Amino acid sequence: VIIIGGGICGCALAYFLALDGVEVTLLERSGLNSASSGANSGSLHGQIPHETFLDKGEEWAHTFGPTLSLMHESIQLWKKIEESLETDLEIRLTGGLLVAKNDKEIKAIRAKAAIEKKFGIHSEHLDKSQLRKFAPYLSEDTIGAMYYPEEGKANPLLVTPAFALKAEILGVQITRQAEVKGILVKRKGFRVDTTKGSFTCNRVVNCAGIDVGSINAMVGLANKVFAEPIQSNVTEPMEQLVDHLIYSAGERLTLKQTLHGSFIIGGGWPCLINKITGRLLICFDSFIRNLTVATGVVPSLESAQLVRTWPAWVNATDDWIPILGEADSIRGFFVCAFPYLGFTGGPISARILADMILS
C-alpha cells in the first residue's frame, strides 16, 4: 500500500496497517504534520458545527447527522490513542459548552440539540444558575448553554508525529520531500511517480488533505474537495481557568486552554491570500472579531497577552460530508477526506480505511 499524505489520517492509517503486517510506504511532499493536521487548533468535536447549522439550516443538519456517528466513534479511539502509542498527547475530554446570551440563541441551540439527539448525541441544557456553578469563568450575560461531555482537545503538534514514529518502528517506509507528480493505473496495481523516484504498489490511498483533488485528478476522478484559508490565535500561559471546549451561539468561536495554560482561540475565521505569491496573510478584521467574541464569552481573557496569530489551509467541501472509501471506477484506489473536522475524524477515517484494505 502507498499512502499519499503525511497528516493525521495518513500516519494513523500507516500505523494501523503496519500493525497487521501490511507493507506500507508513505509519501509526503514536505514534512510530516506540516499542513492542516499540525496547524489546526486541536479541538476534538462531537456536535454539529453551530455556525454552519445557522447558515445551512435543519435540512442540511439532518444530512450531516450520520457524520456524528463517525465523530463519536473517533472520540472513542481518541480515548485509547495515548495508551496505544505509549506517549502523552495532551488529550483531555472534559466536554464542550455551546453558550448563548439571548432567547434567540437559546432557541437555536435547542433546535440543533434536538436534531443531534436523533443521531445519538445527547446534550444537556444548562440554565444560567447551573452555568454559574459549572463554568464560573463565563461572562455574566451568558443565560444558558448546551453541554456535550464527549468533546475536548489534544495537541496537534504531538499526535501525527506519534503515529508516524510508531509506524516507522513497525516497518513503514516514510519518504519525505516526495511530491507526487503522476499516478499510472496499471493492469495490476499502480505506479506512483514522485520527485524522489517511482514506486509501485497494489493499492493507493489518497490522504493528501487540501491536495486530495489534485491527486484524484491524476487518475481521472472528480473532485469535491477545496482548500479554505482560516486563522487561529494563541495567548501567553495563564492560570488554569477553562476546563471545557467553548463555542458561542452568537458568532464563530472555539476556545480552549492548553495544559500549559495558553488559550487557543479560533472558530474558522477567514484569513487572506496574497494574490501574487499565494501565501496566506492574517486578516485584521477576523482577528479583531474573533478576539472580541472570545473576551465577550470569557472576560478574564481581556488581560491576556497574545503571542501569535497564524493562518492555515483546511480541506473543505460544500456539504461538510466526509469522503471515505474505494473509488468505484478504479479498484485499489482509496480516498480519505474529512472536511473541516479532520483532526477529530482522522483516527476513525484511518481505522475504516485500514479495515477496508485488510478485508
Which role fits each region the language model picked out?
Residues S123, T292-S359:
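C-terminal catalytic lobe of FAD-dependent flavoproteins
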Residues A12, L19, G57-G65, I183-D285, ...:
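Flavin-dependent oxidoreductases
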Residues A145-N202:
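Helical element adjacent to the flavin cofactor pocket in flavoenzyme catalytic cores
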Residues A18-N40:
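Glycine-rich FAD pyrophosphate-binding loop
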Residues T87-A100, K112-A113, F119, S123-L170, ...:
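Helix-loop-beta segment of a Rossmann-like dinucleotide-binding subdomain
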Residues V1-L26:
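N-terminal Rossmann-like FAD-binding beta1-loop-alpha1 element of flavoenzymes
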Residues S43-Q130, R252:
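Dinucleotide-binding Rossmann-like beta1-alpha1 core, especially the glycine-rich loop
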